Structures are given as C-alpha cells and as structure tokens.
Amino acid sequence: MLFRSLIADIAGLPKANLHYYFPTKEDLYRRVVQTIFEIWLHAAEAMDDAPGPVEGIGRYIDAKMEISRLHPNGSKVWAYEVMHGAPVIQDYLETTLRDWTAGRVHLIQRWIDEGKMSRINPEHLLYMLWATTQHYADFGHQIATLNGGPLSDAEWQAAKTSVKTMILRGIGALT
C-alpha cells in the first residue's frame, strides 16, 4: 500500500479519495496510460488544420518532443505496457489507437495524393514519428550521458529542428 499512499501524497489527495476514484491498482495504472495517450492525441491536433506536411508534421514533431521533455515518465510507462504485450490496455489499442491511426493515415495519404510529399507508407511514417520523438523520453538518460548532461533549452530546440528537417526532407516535403 506504500505505492498508493505515495501517489496520494504526491497528488495532494487523501488516500481514501484515491481508493474511491481508483478502486484497484489496475484502474489507476490504466488511467495513467490513458492520460499520456490523451496528451499525445491532443498534440496530433496540430496536424488537423495544416495545409500540408511541413506545417502539420512539423508542429506534431514539436509537440511530441516537448511532451517527451516535460512528461518523460508517461512515455516510459506507455512503452513498458506495450513491450509487455499491453495486458491492461490492449482493448484501447484495438479501438481508440486504431481509429486515431486510421484518421492520421487518411490525412497523410491526402497530402501524398496532393503531391505534397513522397509516396510512402503513412503507417510507417507514424511509427517513425513515434519512435523518434519518444526516444527523447524513453532514452533520456542515455542522451544525457552522451551529451554530458540533460539537454539545455537551446539543445532541445536544435534537436527539434534537426528531427523536423531530417523527417520532412526524408518524406520529400522539404527540398
């Protein structure tokens, strides 16, 4: 019970409230995993009204990398869950994530059909975007070790610019 007591203390809630809203550890864990996914979904809204991939994917990369910077533990929890076969959130992957992904694929395919980017597989672009942006959270310790310390604000900005340039050029959206 130390785990739940610690969470209640960090959240500034009485332990009884935590038990009321999350009767089991699985309920609490599921909510944590869903919350990081909801944060990522919100980040993807940057693509919705974009005229093309430079703006849409560029803003998405900025948002996802900022989330990796500000909420690295959320990404690590998500990665842990998925790497273990998603025992708690498999239904979420099969519904919410699948539907969301289909919508992003449709948008990216539209940009491809409009000649705004190379003919690539939209799903694999999404996988690459997720892997690249979440790497900065999931492997933050490795990056900090190789960098001689955590990335500074300027280094984060440079990383975002580099990632955007490499991906957008790689998909033929930048020349």
Predicted ranges, named:
Residues E66, L70, R98, A102-E114, ...:
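C-terminal peripheral helix-coil segments that are non-catalytic and often amphipathic
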